Amino acid sequence: LSILEKKMIQFASVRCSEDAWQKRTKSARMVFRQVREMKEIMIATSNAHKVEEFTQMLAPLGYQVRSLLDLEEAIDIEENGTTFEENALIKARAAHERLHTAVISDDSGLAVDAMDGAPGVYSARFLGYDTDYATKNQYIIDQVKDKERGAQFVCAIGYVAEDGSEHVFTGIVRGEIAPQISGEKGFGYDPIFYYPPYHATLAEVSEEQKNAVSHRGRALAKLIAFLKGEGQ
């Protein structure tokens, strides 16, 4: 349900005196006005976790957030870019062309120095979609054995405004490939990404600690700063 629908159901479900009714009518009008004034923004993802994260960041700025989960028909988007930035804009551009509204999309992954930046944009499908991350992580550890262990998580957020103008914001967190898989928190490549300031992998720290330095958080901060300036 939309914000408006939820508010109106709540409004209609309460029986009250004439005085209270007038107050609630005034409140309902304010809700209508607030919803009309809200700017809509589409998150080009079907990942519920990402939708929640973006919503928490954008709602305070007056945005009504929607996602691909709200659409009756799926949008098929081929991510064929060679960089995170290209893929982020490809997804945002495709959704904008279909929906004609402001769109945000992101692409992220792990880039290992000793592997010439791999798995990079292929992080999700590295060694095949059906390969579990324990296998992927051990493979990377074996590849960097006795080599440079530097690595970075990268997140690029593509933003296509309602008028079609395009922008991209990149967040990076540097670290090292751990000598062994460590930690049971997080997901993906977190158990092998050692973050020196924490003296631990990202799978060994709390979600709050991870989010404080995450690549997505850093990219989001840049997007938020831009949107705040755009609204002035």
Where are these regions (language model features)?
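Anionic-ligand binding patches
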Residues: K39-M42, A48-Q232
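Polybasic, lysine-rich low-complexity intrinsically disordered segments
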Residues: K6-M8, K23-S27
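Short, Lys/Arg-enriched N-terminal segments with co-localized hydrophobic residues
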Residues: K26-E37, G229
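Short hydrophobic alpha-helical segments enriched in small aliphatic residues
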Residues: A12-V14, A20, A28
